[in-house]
Amino acid sequence: GDSSSRAKALARAVADGRVLELSVYSPSMKRHVPVRVLVPADRSMPRPTLYLLNGAGGGEGTGHWFEQTDIVDFVADKNVNVVVPMRGAYSYYTDWLKVDPVLGRNKWTTFLTSELPPLIDRKLNTTGVNAIAGISMAGTSSLSLAEAAPQLYRAVASYSGCADTSTNLGRLAIRAVVEGRGGGDIANIWGPVGSPGWRAHDPVVNAYKLRGRAIYISTGTGVPGPHDQLQGQGIDGKTTIYIDQIAVGGAIEAATHQCTLNLDRRLKQLGIPATVDYA
């Protein structure tokens, strides 16, 4: 549906008491993080939890799950809690080595694996069974977080994310997001480019840590598809958006396609089953 129908779906869910707007203090980041939670209509039993991460904008603009997808309607009949942090733009949802002059203090691995889950488990009476998924920038993050805390997540999904961080292609993708869009300095993430921290956080290098998890990965090819037309959803005849979607979006999707091939190959070498969808 379009954004007005999505807004209505969200309003209905709010009215039904299915949406919780939390403000969660992060000791590691020394600030409050807004977290939007979708709970099932039937809360009589403990439920599993899906941690769903927004793309590059971190949910701070309109490019987030609630604005761009039918997530509210999609999970309405699923017996699952959905937890969406609404901050973290251009952070890659990782623990940064240094405070960035533009992007500030980012300790998202700590927040998402240590600080937030115990609070969610207590507040929502969960089963303690978790999954994590992310799109675009956060597709990389979801894989990395699942490797950082394998005992925490039963399943992981990455949509249009580049799994590499220590290859030229992976670094290019991170630079495009953090520096190109966020104005930050990528050396503040894991140290200077090429330093050991970059390999230590590379989901392809560390893919063996995903063993035993349910894994879903999807990517496009970067070739313009049926929605990439001037009248397509979210474009509405605006030429600059169209050019941006084809040139920038296409290039990013082509890069994530190659990254996904790399991850797919690595998982096969390791004998780790995964569902990989080349849309």
Model-inferred region functions:
Residues 1-279:
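Non-catalytic cap/lid and distal C-terminal segments of serine-dependent acyl enzymes
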